[in-house]
A protein has these predicted regions:
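Short acidic/histidine-rich motifs immediately flanking catalytic phosphotransfer sites
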Residues: 1-6, 94, 373-376
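Phosphate-binding loop of NTP-binding sites
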Residues: 2-3, 11-156, 160-170, 222, ...
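P-loop/Walker A phosphate-binding loop and immediately adjacent motor/lid segment at beta-alpha junctions
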Residues: 22-28, 142-150, 170, 280-289, ...
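Beta-strand->loop->alpha-helix junctions that form or flank phosphate-binding loops
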Residues: 31-38, 76-79, 170-191, 209-215, ...
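Nucleotide phosphate-binding/pyrophosphate-handling subdomain across enzymes
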Residues: 114, 192-193, 202-322
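Short internal beta-strands
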Residues: 152-156, 295-299, 320-330
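C-terminal helical cap/extension that packs against the catalytic core
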Residues: 264, 314-374
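A glycine-rich beta-strand to alpha-helix segment
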Residues: 364-394
Length: 398
């Protein structure tokens, strides 16, 4: 029987975790996830993908394209890539692709050869002394971790990226819908299940089909495309990989559909838990399914995030047709006075949106046993245990 030689932990694991306690009692070395990734990068061409939103999807797309190109990469991701049925793979190729986590500053331990920054917004500020400026400085430091011949691929549409670019001190390539970018997106359209777009540089222009919904995912795809083009992967390989991409667990994942009376009911599960992410999900659904009613079951995630972005949550949650609010998922945090779902409901009603109900997890299923006036999408939104609720409900009613 092989003995444990080392334990690797993420910042989500508390010090009183029984496996961690046991490791320390047995004097087994304990290493932070980012420290291990940094060590692994010493022997690979490291690609680190960071940003407030979209890094899991972008990491998944890069890993899928490089696998399609027979590069056999090692990847470590924040979500399950459906085609691999895993969030990680140990490959024998030269590449190590990692989702870089800014939430606890651990991305600053990485020293990649290439980096991607998808966007920068206020989040996890509790780990930055409550200062957005400190978070911005951390992203600048992340980019400066690149070697002198490294390159950062950045979303040039992002307001904060634009602000910081002058201080990058490393070569960078920008992408986005705005014409000032090095790679410009255009001709975006959707057919309800796929996205179509063109990506143009000074020298080339290519058409792509992406098996995902939403302009935000087109931006994620653009980051992956630019990186893979820079690494010498053929355009046809990239096009085929994006067209056949099977998605990521809980990233606008269509669980399925069923008939309720004469109406179609479509079920979508989504991990987004920041107001910007929720807004992008709503926009993507409205664009792709304009004739459907949109009902959302939302589980707020963390008391600190809900407090810091309270007004933004009130604004974005009012854009659905009907909202079902679950209790806040603490993620190990202590409650904050006045920050709770009943107060969110009250604030929404005061803002003029009154089609909002408070539910516990056992009551959610009752909302699916009702006749529908029209075709409807139920989206389960949040980063807590709402996924287990959505899966059990869909299995029960499909």
């Amino acid at each position: 029987k092989r003995q444990v030689e080392m334990v690797v932990k993420s910042s989500a694991i508390s010090d009183d975790n029984p496996e961690l306690v046991s490791a320390k009692e047995q004097l087994i070395p304990v290493l932070a996830r980012a420290e291990m990734l940094s060590s692994l990068m010493n022997n690979k061409r490291g690609i680190a993908i960071a940003g407030t939103h979209g890094k899991t999807t972008t990491t998944s797309l890069v890993a899928s394209i490089m696998t399609s190109a027979n590069l056999d990469p090692t990847f470590i991701n924040g979500g399950i890539i459906n085609s691999f049925n895993s969030n990680a793979q140990l490959g024998e190729g030269d590449y190590l692709i990692v989702e870089a986590d800014e939430s606890d500053k651990s991305f600053l331990l990485l020293q990649p050869s290439v980096s991607i920054v998808t966007n920068i917004e206020p989040d996890h500020l509790v780990n930055y002394d409550g200062s957005f400026d400190n978070l911005k400085k951390a992203f600048l430091e992340f980019i400066k971790k690149l070697p002198f011949n490294g390159v950062s691929i950045v979303c040039g549409d992002d307001t904060v990226v634009k602000e910081l670019k002058i201080n990058f001190q490393r070569p960078h390539i920008s992408y986005g819908f705005e014409s000032s970018n090095d790679y410009v997106l255009s001709s975006y359209r959707t057919d309800g299940r796929n996205s179509y777009f063109k990506l143009t540089s000074d020298t080339d222009s290519f058409d792509f089909k992406l098996n995902m919904l939403g302009k935000h995912n087109v931006l994620n795809a653009a980051a992956a495309i630019v990186l893979c083009l820079q690494e010498g992967i053929a355009v046809k390989v990239i096009q085929d990989s994006l067209s056949n991409f099977m998605g990521i667990d809980r990233r606008m994942q269509i669980l399925g559909e069923k008939k309720i009376g004469s109406s179609t009911c479509l079920y979508i599960d989504d991990y987004g838990h920041h107001p910007t992410e929720i807004n992008k999900t709503i926009q993507a659904i409205r664009t792709s399914f304009p004739d459907f009613e949109l009902k959302m079951v939302f589980q707020p995630h963390r008391f600190t995030r809900t407090k810091d972005l309270y007004e933004e949550f009130i604004e974005v949650l009012s854009h659905v047709d009907e909202l079902f609010l679950l209790d806040i998922y603490s993620a190990g945090e202590n409650p904050i006075e006045g920050i709770n779902s009943p107060n969110i409901q009250s604030s929404l009603i005061r803002s003029g949106f009154d089609n909002v109900k408070l539910l516990n997890s056992n009551e959610v299923a009752k909302e699916y046993d009702k006749d529908l006036a029209k075709d409807t999408i139920f989206v389960f939104q949040g980063a807590g245990d709402i996924s287990s609720i959505s899966q059990s409900i869909f299995e029960e009613f499909k």
